[in-house]
């Protein structure tokens, strides 16, 4: 009899991806439960023939293993019932670590760029015939969703530093896209974040490899027993890009790896940050034996992932784009990328701050992140379910600070009011860019309906 593995909160992006690859790797019977509200992952789970039930303690009674989303605590009826029956309960990172241990792991970590870099590598490996297993934190059209169950030796996974979750993994290869202070509800300061990345770097075996951004100020703090390969825009990096030209369809550049010119490369996603994501992907793929021409060709066809500078549509000659950026560096990079690709458009950024703790701790950094925008609209803060203190900072104070930086900024309380304001003020040539990890994407969708 195959194992029966039940996923509590299966509609989450990570959980739905994990459920799909579990069915393949474990040869298990998979069930899941979640709220009735429909998400994009419903279609993913339907295609995988994974049943999704309403929450009920009875759902776990015949399960051999329960995997629980971080969104639900020990008091949840299904988790509590599993504990009563002595059924093993895994967290998402614990179970991902279990699956990765069965293959050659590739972990993509870093404060920013994890999803895009994972998706880029996944596409390159698939198109080169390596056939990896992939778990990624977004819908990626080029790999057919947020997961792929391959027959090959490699297990590629987006790996988050929050609460040191990635220490549950034992990868052979590790990418660190960048290291910055984030998740202030867990990490004390930047040193604490660096310590976490050092801890996972030390888990990489001597025969493995670590790939890290050459220009990262924290790079030299990472100590490891395995060789470290650098990527960046500096010629001192092991893998770097030169002769970079930006245009409205992305960028063109020359790739150099370990002193050898690999050739010209076309990237169809905008911004310097995506060039760095591509360089990390190229460095990794070359190291594991993917032919140069396969790497460059496959990445030249990469068109992005859901909620990463995703083109939603147009309205009255205005372009509507959505992005998941919710950290000051991500916002700055996304807006600067938009300015490079669309120099003649009026850029109207609509930002929904994500969590009170992040907004409070990084308030000054946020206020200085919108210089590339012509106008900024700040929505109400999107609170995390794990937050208890919701009165530490206000969204209107962030709008005021942005205005003090010389940027036209305003606070508008509700998404409905923002939709109305934008609909009434759209002009041909505008670029409306919604930013945030909450539900701000609904604004862009409403403008193209």
Curated annotation (Swiss-Prot):
The keyword Transcription regulation does not apply. One of its GO terms (biological process) is cell wall organization. It catalyses: UDP-N-acetyl-alpha-D-muramate + L-alanine + ATP = UDP-N-acetyl-alpha-D-muramoyl-L-alanine + ADP + phosphate + H(+). GO terms for molecular function: ATP binding; UDP-N-acetylmuramate-L-alanine ligase activity. Its EC number is 6.3.2.8. ATP binds at residues 110-116. It is found in: Cytoplasm. It comes from the Bacteria. Coiled coil: none annotated. One of its GO terms (cellular component) is cytoplasm. Keywords: ATP-binding, Cell cycle, Cell division, Cell shape, Cell wall biogenesis/degradation, Cytoplasm, Ligase, Nucleotide-binding, Peptidoglycan synthesis. Pathway: Cell wall biogenesis; peptidoglycan biosynthesis. CDD domains: SIMIBI. Signal peptide: none annotated. InterPro entries: Mur-like_cat_sf, Mur_ligase_C, Mur_ligase_C_dom_sf, Mur_ligase_cen, Mur_ligase_N, MurCDEF_pg_biosynth, UDP-N-AcMur_Ala_ligase_MurC. Belongs to the MurCDEF family. Cell wall formation. PANTHER family: UDP-N-ACETYLMURAMATE--L-ALANINE LIGASE, UDP-N-ACETYLMURAMATE--L-ALANINE LIGASE-RELATED. This is UDP-N-acetylmuramate--L-alanine ligase. It comes from Desulfitobacterium hafniense (strain Y51). The gene is murC.
């Amino acid at each position: 009899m195959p194992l029966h593995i039940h996923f509590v909160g299966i509609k989450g992006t990570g959980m739905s991806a994990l459920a799909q690859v579990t069915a393949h790797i474990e040869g298990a019977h998979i069930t899941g439960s979640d709220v009735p509200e429909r998400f994009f992952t419903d279609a993913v789970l339907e295609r995988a023939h994974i049943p999704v039930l309403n929450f009920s303690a009875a759902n776990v009674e015949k399960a051999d293993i329960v995997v629980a989303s971080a969104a639900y605590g020990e008091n949840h009826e299904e988790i509590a019932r599993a504990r009563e029956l002595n059924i093993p309960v895994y967290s998402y990172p614990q179970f991902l670590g279990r699956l990765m241990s069965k293959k050659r792991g590739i972990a993509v970590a870093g404060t920013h760029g994890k999803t895009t870099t994972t998706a880029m590598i996944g596409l390159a490996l698939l198109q080169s015939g390596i056939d990896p297993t992939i778990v990624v934190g977004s819908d990626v059209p080029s790999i057919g969703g947020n997961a792929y169950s391959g027959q090959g030796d490699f297990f590629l996974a987006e790996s988050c530093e929050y609460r040191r979750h990635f220490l549950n993994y034992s990868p052979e290869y590790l990418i660190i896209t960048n290291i910055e202070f984030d998740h202030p509800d867990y990490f004390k300061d930047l040193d604490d974040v660096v310590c976490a990345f050092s801890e996972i770097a030390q888990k990489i075996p001597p025969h493995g490899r670590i790939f890290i951004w050459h220009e990262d100020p924290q790079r030299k703090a990472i100590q490891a027993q395995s060789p470290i390969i650098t990527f960046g825009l500096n010629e001192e990096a092991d893998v770097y890009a030169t002769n970079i030209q930006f245009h409205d369809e992305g960028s063109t550049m020359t790739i150099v790896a370990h002193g050898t010119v690999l050739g010209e490369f076309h990237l169809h996603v905008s911004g310097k940050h995506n060039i760095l994501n591509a360089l990390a992907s190229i460095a990794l793929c070359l190291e594991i034996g993917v032919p140069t021409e396969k790497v460059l060709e496959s990445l030249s066809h990469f068109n992005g992932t859901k909620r990463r500078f995703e083109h939603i549509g147009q309205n009255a000659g205005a372009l509507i784009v959505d992005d998941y950026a919710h950290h000051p560096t991500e916002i700055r990079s996304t807006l600067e990328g938009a300015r490079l690709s669309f120099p003649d458009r009026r850029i109207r950024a609509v930002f929904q701050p994500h969590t009170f703790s992040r907004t409070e701790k990084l308030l000054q950094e946020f206020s200085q992140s919108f210089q590339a925008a012509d106008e900024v609209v700040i929505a109400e803060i999107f609170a995390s379910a794990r937050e208890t203190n919701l009165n530490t900072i206000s969204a209107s104070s962030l709008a005021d600070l942005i205005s003090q930086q010389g940027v036209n900024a305003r606070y508008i309380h509700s998404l409905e009011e923002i939709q109305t304001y934008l609909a009434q003020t759209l002009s041909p040539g505008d670029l409306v860019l919604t930013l945030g990890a909450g539900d701000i994407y609904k604004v862009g969708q409403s403008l193209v309906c």
